[in-house]
Design a protein with these regions (language model features):
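Gly/Gly-Pro-rich "capping" loops immediately C-terminal to redox-active cysteine motifs
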Residues: 39-50, 66-93
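The canonical Cys-X-X-Cys-His
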Residues: 49, 53-63, 115-119
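Short, small-residue-rich loop/turn micro-motifs
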Residues: 29, 64, 92, 96
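Electrostatic cytochrome c docking/interface patches
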Residues: 22-52
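Axial heme c-ligation environment in periplasmic c-type cytochrome domains
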Residues: 17-21, 39, 68-76, 93-129
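Bacterial N-terminal signal peptides
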Residues: 3-13
């Protein structure tokens, strides 16, 4: 039983590492990569996205999006600078269940874009410190 527990823990650590390094980026179709966020840099969208994030995302990624033992930080260079808005949108709509990321398509596009706006605002907040 201990061996099963250790194997499960190792699998979770591997899962977090693979997700953190952005392996999901390779799954995004080219047609989705260039989508642009209609709410980018809008303060109202940041506030709305923060509420949605806390309701749906914080339990895995942490209240401050710094990540948890089981899920990666969303303040990484990969998420903040390397991934396009379209790639982030695709991930939220489609999920990446093999790595523990569910689809949030039930939220609808406005809320998904607001979450992206909020998450991207964390980079600006961090840079201004």
């Amino acid at each position: 039983m201990l061996l099963v527990g250790l194997l499960a823990l190792s699998a979770l650590n591997l899962l977090a590492t693979v997700t953190a390094d952005g392996g999901w980026l390779n799954k995004v179709p080219a047609k989705d990569r260039d989508k642009t966020n209609p709410y980018a840099n809008q303060p109202d969208a940041v506030a709305a996205g923060q509420r949605v994030f806390h309701d749906h995302c914080a339990h895995c990624h942490g209240d401050d999006a710094e990540g948890t033992k089981k899920r990666p930080s969303l303040r990484t260079e990969r998420v903040q600078q390397q991934a396009t808005e379209g790639e982030l949108h695709w991930l939220l709509v489609n999920g990446y269940m093999s790595h523990g990321m569910p689809s949030w398509s039930k939220l609808g596009d406005p809320q998904i874009w607001q979450v992206i706006t909020y998450v991207r605002s964390l980079h600006l907040e961090q840079a201004s410190r």
